[in-house]
Amino acid sequence: MAKESTTIDVGEPSTVTKSSSHVVKKKGFVAAAAGGGAKRGLAIFDFLLRLAAIGVTIGAASVMYTAQETLPFFTQFLQFQAGYDDLPAFQYFVIAVAIVASYLVLSLPFSIVTIVRPLAVAPRLILLIFDTLVVTLNTSAAAAAASIVYLAHNGNQSTNWLPICQQFGDFCQNVSTAVVAASIAILFFIVLIIISAIALKRH
């Protein structure tokens, strides 16, 4: 008579299961720490870039606001004057770029929060949205001023607008410098938007 064989399955010890779970959690913590470190680095660069953009935008608005030149002709009673307030495009530039600079100052606390809490989504998302809106304002101001600067340098033969930069050299140099500074600020904003997009993508 054949004997029946009995097979007994012995499960893994609970200590092995707990050990595996501990290893998985540890790897998760290490990955999270590495991701947080990378995001903190992006946040620090974001903060420094905002400081630089503040300086550039304040400089652009100040240079445009103080752009003025007076040319005497024949007598001191007959003078020709050129100033930023003579052209609506330059007035818009000063107001718009001043708003951009104010926004950048107000955005610094949110940038600091992303340094302290690099994994936080809300402040980074807020910065991304408002950076996108403000760079549009900055771009429109720079484009409007750049068109007038071009006319000041080259004129327009079709409308008989003569270039004035040969006479008002200092004025044209100041407004051109302001437009270049505003264009640099646009590049800063593009980098800031890319930083925020990368930080959010890592989530």
From Swiss-Prot:
One GO term describing the cellular component: Casparian strip
Top-level taxon of the source organism: Eukaryota
Transmembrane regions: 41-61, 93-113, 125-145, 178-198
Cytoplasmic side: 2-40, 114-124, 199-203
Pfam families: CASP_dom (PF04535)
Extracellular side: 62-92, 146-177
Subcellular localization(s) per the UniProt record: Cell membrane
Annotated membrane topology: Multi-pass membrane protein
MF-aspect GO terms: protein homodimerization activity
InterPro entries in alphabetical order: CASP/CASPL, CASP_dom, CASPL
Function statement: Regulates membrane-cell wall junctions and localized cell wall deposition. Required for establishment of the Casparian strip membrane domain (CSD) and the subsequent formation of Casparian strips, a cell wall modification of the root endodermis that determines an apoplastic barrier between the intraorganismal apoplasm and the extraorganismal apoplasm and prevents lateral diffusion.
Family label: Belongs to the Casparian strip membrane proteins (CASP) family.
Subunit structure: Homodimer and heterodimers.
Protein name in the entry: Casparian strip membrane protein 1
Originating organism: Arabidopsis lyrata subsp. lyrata
